[in-house]
C-alpha cells in the first residue's frame, strides 16, 4: 500500500472515531482493493489503526513518539509518517471529543426541603416530633435527565447527616488546598 492510501485510511478511521459512527467500509474497500486484501485483512487493518489512534489520543502521545514506536514495531518509515501526520492534524479534535465523552458523575441539580411536625408515621417511631422531608433532584450528564429522590428522616438523623456532611466538606477543602 502507498503512503497516501495509508493516510486516507487513517483519516477514515479518525473520522469514524470523531463522529461516533461506523466506518464507511465501501470507501475503505476502494482504498485497499489494489493491495489484494481479503475482508479479514481489511477489518484487521482498520482495527489496528483504530487501536493505534485511540490509544495515542488517550495517552497524549506526540507525533514523533508515535512515529518512532510504529517504526520499532516494524512498519515502514513512510507509513509511520503518514499515520503520524494524520494523527497530528486531528489530535486536538479527538482529544476534545474524548474529553466530552468521558465518564461524568451525576450532579445535584437542586435540593428542596421542608420540616413537618409528624403526628403519626409508618417510618418514624416517635410521634409529635419534627421530620425533615428532602427531595434531591439529580442531573445525569450522559442524557441530561433529571431524576427526583425524595425521602424523609427524623430531625435527629438530619442533624447527624448535616454535621457529617460539613465534616466531609471540610476534609475535601483541606485536600484541595
UniProtKB/Swiss-Prot annotation:
- Which species does the entry assign this protein to? Dictyostelium discoideum (Social amoeba)
Every COMM domain range: 107-176
Highest taxon of the lineage = Eukaryota
Q: Name one Pfam family in it.
A: COMM_domain
Protein's UniProt name: COMM domain-containing protein 4
User: How does this polypeptide assemble, per the annotation?
Assistant: Component of the commander complex consisting of the CCC subcomplex and the retriever subcomplex. Component of the CCC subcomplex.
Family label: Belongs to the COMM domain-containing protein 4 family.
* Role this protein plays: Scaffold protein in the commander complex that is essential for endosomal recycling of transmembrane cargos; the commander complex is composed of the CCC subcomplex and the retriever subcomplex.
- Gene Ontology terms: biological process: signal transduction
Amino acid at each position: 500500500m502507498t503512503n497516501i492510501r495509508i493516510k486516507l485510511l487513517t483519516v477514515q478511521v479518525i473520522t469514524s472515531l470523531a463522529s461516533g459512527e461506523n466506518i464507511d467500509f465501501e470507501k475503505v474497500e476502494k482504498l485497499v482493493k489494489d493491495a489484494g486484501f481479503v475482508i479479514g485483512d481489511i477489518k484487521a487493518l482498520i482495527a489496528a489503526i483504530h487501536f493505534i489512534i485511540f490509544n495515542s489520543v488517550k495517552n497524549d502521545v506526540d507525533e514523533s513518539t508515535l512515529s518512532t514506536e510504529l517504526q520499532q514495531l516494524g512498519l515502514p518509515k513512510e507509513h509511520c509518517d503518514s499515520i503520524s501526520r494524520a494523527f497530528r492534524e486531528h489530535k486536538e479534535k479527538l482529544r476534545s471529543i474524548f474529553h466530552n465523552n468521558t465518564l461524568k458523575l451525576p450532579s445535584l441539580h437542586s435540593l428542596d426541603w421542608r420540616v413537618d411536625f409528624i403526628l403519626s408515621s409508618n417510618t418514624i417511631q416517635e410521634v409529635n416530633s419534627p421530620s425533615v422531608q428532602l427531595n434531591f433532584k439529580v442531573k445525569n450528564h450522559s442524557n441530561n435527565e433529571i431524576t427526583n429522590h425524595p425521602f424523609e428522616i427524623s430531625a435527629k438523623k438530619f442533624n447527624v447527616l448535616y454535621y457529617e456532611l460539613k465534616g466531609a466538606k471540610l476534609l475535601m477543602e483541606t485536600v484541595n488546598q
